[in-house]
Every structure is written in C-alpha cells, then in structure tokens.
Curated annotation (Swiss-Prot):
Changing residue 225 to L: In CDSP; reduces carnitine transport to less than 20% of wild-type activity. The lineage of its organism: Eukaryota, Metazoa, Chordata, Craniata, Vertebrata. It comes from Homo sapiens (Human). Changing residue 264 to M: In CDSP; uncertain significance; reduces carnitine transport but the mutant retains more than 40% of wild-type activity. Residues 535-557 are annotated as: Disordered. It is a multi-pass membrane protein. GO terms for molecular function: (R)-carnitine transmembrane transporter activity; amino-acid betaine transmembrane transporter activity; ATP binding; carnitine transmembrane transporter activity; PDZ domain binding; quaternary ammonium group transmembrane transporter activity; symporter activity; xenobiotic transmembrane transporter activity. Changing residue 211 to C: In CDSP; loss of carnitine transport. ATP binds at residues 218-225. This is Organic cation/carnitine transporter 2. Changing residue 312 to V: In CDSP; uncertain significance; reduces carnitine transport but the mutant retains 70% of wild-type activity.
Length: 557
C-alpha cells in the first residue's frame, strides 16, 4: 500500500503549481495580520478633558483653569475626568476674581465631566472611544472590546477544525474569509457600542477560522519539504506583513469608520483567489471523491509540465487510515500519569504566558513614547527576524535552551524598562522591541516543542489544550495594558516577571531535539528532576499505531 505522498511524488516539490499555492495561501493570511491588531487604532484613547459649554459665562482666565492638574509619569498634566465645579467658578468669574491670585484652586470643589469630553484630534479624528465616550467611568469598555474579540478567536478555534473536516478546507477558507471581511464592514454601521462588540466577536471567529483553514490546506497540498517552510515562515511572515500594513493605513486614515473601509478592501480582493486555490486532494480522498482529487492532480501536473500516469488514485491501493482500529482517548489522558500531568500543566502555563506577552506588547504600542504609527510598524517588523531565528533554532539547536533563551531575553529587557531615565524614551522603545522579538521567537517555537513532547495517541489533544490556554492569555492581555493607566511600568514588570519565571519553568521540560516522536504515553520523555513513578494507568495505556521516527520542524498554528 502507498500513502498520498508516495502516490503524488511525481509532481515534484517546488514546481509552478506548488509555488502558486504557497504564495496565494500565504497572501490570504495578510488580512489576518491587520484585522487581529486593528484595535490598536480603532480603540485608541486620545488625550481628553472635560468639556465646558460655550454658554458658560467664564472669563478667559477661568476658561484656562477649569480643569485641575494631576501627576502622571512624574509631571503635572490636566485631569482627564474631573473639572472644577462649574457653578462655583462661574460665580468667581462674575465677581472678577482671578484664579490662583484671588482663589486657591486647591480648595475648589470638583465634579465629573457632566457635559462630556473634548478629545484631541492631533493624532486621531475619531475612534470608537471618542464615538461613544469610553473614558473615565467607562474606560473599562475599551479593553473589554479587545478581550471579546479574542473570545471570538477562542470560539472560532473550537469550530474551525470540525467545519473544515465536514465541509472541506477550501469552502471553509472562503466562507470564513467572507465572514471576517463582511462583519468588519458591518462594524462601520454600528449604532452603538454593543453592536460594535457583537460584530467584533464574529470577526474574531472568522479571523482564526480562515487562518486555520489556509494553514491546513497548505500543509495538505504542498510536499513534505515545502510544507516545513510554509508552516514556519510562509504564513508567519505574511501575517507580519499584514501587521506592517496596518499602521500605514492608519497613518493616512485617521477616522475609524473610514479605516475599517480600507481594511476590508484586501479581503474583498481575496475573493478572486477562489479560481486559483483548489480543494485539498487529501480531504477529497478522505471523502471518497477520488475523481475530483484526480482532476486537481492532473491540473497540477500540467502546470508543472509533467506527464501524468494513466491512473493516479487506486482506491484499493491507498491507505485508509480511518479503517485502522484505534483505542479511544479523552482529555483526561493528559492528566493520567504524573509525567504527562506535569507536561500538560507546564505547557498550559508556558502558552498562556507567551500569549499574554505577545499580545500585551503588540497592544501597548500606543503607550510608547514617539510616533504611534512608527512604533506599531517597528513592532510588526521585528517579528520577521524573530520568525527566521526561530526556524534556524528549530533546525540546529536544542528546544529547551532555545525557548528559555528567547524567553529570558524577552522578559529581562522588560524588567529593565523601569530603570530607563524619562529623557531616554528611545531606549525604552528599543527595549520593548527587543522584548517583542524574544517573545515572538518563543511563540513560533512553542508549537513544535509542544507537539514533540506529547505522544501520537494524544498529540493533537495536547496541542489543542495548550492552544486554548494561549487564547485565554490573549483574552487577558488587554487588561495587562490597562494597568498602565495606574502605573506606566506595571504592565512591563508583570509581563517581564511572568516571562522569566516561564523561562525557568521551561528548563524542567524534557529535551526533544534529535529524538524520535513518542507514540505512547509510556514512551514520553521525563520531566527534569522527576523520578519515574509507576501508576496503574501505565498498564492501561496500549500502543496505538506506529509513526515513523522523525523530528518535527514545523509549527501548527
């Protein structure tokens, strides 16, 4: 019996057909790059202060002293959420009293912004924060909006695999791409905050679903060697390119509704890819649709200038993997023995911390000194060398030390942030970018490392649980950024400390580099410093299928 790769080996690895599929599927990821982090600009909070009605009878001196001062980052700035009691200062103005000279401003009664806010338009013409006044008592709604987007990502990650298994990779790719683009466009017509948030959740569901569908479609169509490059560099770098495009759009378009219009246009253009991207022949074969799969392979051979055998797929010859009797496993197997339990707990902590660091630093770019658009672009650009470095480390160096080094680098520079003098704000920006570099490299490597730790019988389940933990981390990340409103360095201290602790934790995980993939739970590598403990479940676990000893060198997002 021959498997799919052997049957289609005559196509070659890197012909015109494979190159087309590689670049088109990678290009379909570009909208995901700017959709996922568009909240950096859509939900930005400009400088603001309490509005004073034009009808208020105040002298020019009192109009310049309606807002009290407060300390922020060691300097006095106008308060964003309080003003002096308007009726009181109107009386002082009518009496001809001068602020500071005749009236002690420190003794004046204050009130909230009863007449709304005035928002600076130096950077943004409008955001959803200025649209619906998401400041002061309602400032918690801004991070909630971002968290709910990631809730949509979490929900989408649950259903995307099942949908593509049931309806096909190509169908799910384009339907969810349309879902992401369509609901993003509908956000333009949001009448209130609640409508915007509900649509944002649906955008998040579509965003992760088409990402997963494109990833699976590419890994199933492309050959073994190209598959590695596609999964480690192709989708990641094109995602980063989409992220880099985001600040470019936002620089020229300062209104949030018009920015959304611009961000949905590339998604509309992706519709044309329908006529160039085929369905996965592997999936068609799994559905018994051999003739359709053969048509696709013949077109691929024609594009590559290769003579096609008279018969490509012989149903009796292909391995029917689904016919193999398999022992069922459930999520409790990830906790069955002491060793796999420790690997699972440590993997969950690792993934969650890395996700908090990656998205926390990405969302924090508006709070850095300097130009927000340049900072966002740098945050995106630094991901490209991080992905390349991660790929090289996966090829040649041990996993544990590579992961720990990347995390130590990312965490330590974040802790140094509080030591940077205020006048060296460019150094602070450099440190944040170095931290983002380290965390991004670790994020890219953790997929491979986790997959290598778990045995074949529960590998998919183990990576799935870990990936879910990363989604939970992304949901929490906006609130780490939110803490910066109370202490500028608190987010960096928390993220840096967690990242360093996770780096230390990584050193206790087994080293999988250069070792065959385990097939059964008994074959798993042992957690460092832990003695082997026999449990009754060892005898219950039976070997469940064979997998050729190999080393994983690709990520599976």
């Amino acid at each position: 019996m021959r498997d799919y790769d052997e049957v289609t080996a005559f196509l070659g690895e890197w012909g015109p057909f494979q190159r087309l599929i590689f670049f088109l599927l990678s290009a379909s990821i570009i909208p995901n790059g700017f959709t996922g982090l568009s909240s950096v600009f859509l939900i930005a909070t400009p400088e603001h202060r309490c509005r004073v009605p034009d009808a208020a009878n105040l002298s020019s001196a009192w109009r310049n002293h309606t807002v009290p001062l407060r300390l922020r980052d060691g300097r006095e700035v106008p308060h964003s959420c309080r003003r002096y009691r308007l009726a009181t200062i109107a009386n002082f103005s009518a009496l001809g009293l001068e602020p500071g000279r005749d009236v002690d401003l420190g003794q004046l009664e204050q009130e909230s912004c009863l007449d709304g806010w005035e928002f600076s338009q130096d950077v943004y013409l409008s955001t959803i924060v200025t649209e619906w006044n998401l400041v002061c008592e309602d400032d918690w709604k801004a991070p909630l909006t971002i968290s709910l987007f990631f809730v949509g990502v979490l929900l989408g990650s649950f259903i995307s695999g099942q949908l593509s298994d049931r309806f096909g990779r190509k169908n799910v790719l384009f339907v969810t791409m349309g879902m992401q683009t369509g609901f993003s466009f509908l956000q333009i017509f949001s009448k209130n905050f609640e409508m915007f948030v509900v649509l944002f959740v649906l955008v998040g569901m579509g965003q992760i679903s088409n990402y997963v569908a494109a990833f699976v479609l590419g890994t199933e169509i492309l050959g073994k060697s190209v598959r590695i490059i596609f999964s480690t560099l192709g989708v990641c770098i094109f995602y980063a390119f989409g992220y880099m495009v985001l600040p470019l759009f936002a620089y020229f378009i300062r209104d949030w509704r018009m920015l959304l219009v611009a961000l949905t246009m590339p998604g509309v253009l992706c519709v044309a890819l329908w006529w160039f991207i085929p369905e996965s022949p592997r999936w068609l074969i799994s559905q018994g649709r051999f003739e359709e799969a053969e048509v696709i392979i013949r077109k691929a051979a024609k594009a590559n200038g290769i003579v096609v055998p008279s018969t490509i797929f012989d149903p009796s010859e292909l391995q029917d993997l689904s016919s193999k009797k398999q022992q069922s496993h459930n999520i409790l197997d990830l906790l069955r023995t002491w060793n796999i339990r420790m690997v699972t707990i440590m993997s969950i902590m690792l993934w969650m911390t890395i996700s908090v660091g990656y998205f926390g630093l990405s969302l924090d770019t508006p709070n850095l000194h300097g130009d927000i658009f340049v900072n966002c672009f740098l945050s995106a650009m630094v991901e490209v060398p991080a992905y390349v470095l991660a790929w090289l480390l996966l090829q040649y160096l041990p996993r544990r030390y590579s992961m720990a080094t990347a995390l130590f680098l990312g965490g330590s520079v974040l802790l140094f942030m509080q030591l940077v003098p205020p006048d060296l704000y460019y150094l602070a920006t450099v440190l944040v970018m170095v931290g983002k570099f380290g965390v991004t490299a670790a994020f890219s490597m953790v997929y491979v490392y986790t997959a290598e730790l778990y045995p074949t019988v529960v590998r998919n389940m183990g990576v799935g649980v870990s990936s879910t933990a990363s989604r939970l981390g992304s949901i929490l990340s906006p609130y780490f950024v939110y803490l910066g409103a109370y202490d500028r360095f608190l987010p960096y201290i928390l993220m840096g400390s967690l990242t360093i602790l996770t780096a230390i934790l990584t050193l206790f995980l087994p080293e999988s580099f250069g070792t065959p993939l385990p097939d059964t739970i008994d074959q798993m590598l042992r957690v460092k410093g832990m003695k082997h403990r026999k449990t009754p479940s060892h005898t219950r676990m039976l070997k469940d299928g064979q997998e050729r000893p190999t080393i994983l060198k690709s990520t599976a997002f």
